[in-house]
Amino acid sequence: MAPSSAHNNGFYVLMLVGIVVSTMVATCAGSFYQDFDLTWGGDRAKIFNGGQLLSLSLDKVSGSGFKSKKEYLFGRIDMQLKLVAGNSAGTVTAYYLSSQGPTHDEIDFEFLGNLSGDPYILHTNIFTQGKGNREQQFYLWFDPTRNFHTYSIIWKPQHIIFLVDNTPIRVFKNAEPLGVPFPKNQPMRIYSSLWNADDWATRGGLVKTDWSKAPFTAYYRNFKAIEFSSKSSISNSGAEYEANELDAYSRRRLRWVQKYFMIYNYCSDLKRFPQGLPAECKR
């Protein structure tokens, strides 16, 4: 007896679910206690609210930091941050993925503090095999100190996407055919730190940290990681993958951010690269 169409539909749904599960493993953090280690700064780094909230603080003696217990090789990382309020000049809140060693890979969000009323600068960078110098900087279109906002990294063999509140702000494409290394072989941990960088962070170091405002504190919540299978990622064509990650609306949002809020792009800095822009900038 032939199976019913309903039976067939159920079978295909089960097959589809199985395929999705085999190519993507979601890890929703139960708590910061389970997923992260406080690595430096003593009691300046704290986990509270039953493991649902984490804070880092900076004073004149020390900053603080944490790292993930787990390493990741391709995936989507989401974290909600509320940055240092008030006069945060001279401070840097760094949130990034990194491997270890002299040829490490790294994907950076760095939030450069500023005087009260002036906007934060979001500094992004990508290191491949120990080499960075791929900076793009942005103003944010909101006050990142008043509420929590979500900062995300999507990392696959085809490209890396930086997102703020699910709006893409930067796409770094795999340009290995042009001889540009791409992070794809070294698993990376999640790191974050709050530290003093008043020799460069605010107006090139002209504005120093006002220690009378210390301690400076940033807050974290709602961490989530979704791991992608490298095999399934590589099987997608570049164009197909691009369409899956950035639909027409997302591409418009990316252009909007880059037109109105980007304040530095290494791919436009001809003075910095008088012998010619890096190969990935010429695509």
Curated annotation (Swiss-Prot):
Induction: Up-regulated by brassinosteroids, at a post-transcriptional level. One of its GO terms (molecular function) is hydrolase activity, hydrolyzing O-glycosyl compounds. Residues 1-30 form the signal peptide. The keyword Phosphoprotein does not apply. Its main location: secreted. Catalyzes xyloglucan endohydrolysis (XEH) and/or endotransglycosylation (XET). Cleaves and religates xyloglucan polymers, an essential constituent of the primary cell wall, and thereby participates in cell wall construction of growing tissues. This is Xyloglucan endotransglucosylase/hydrolase 2. It comes from Glycine max.
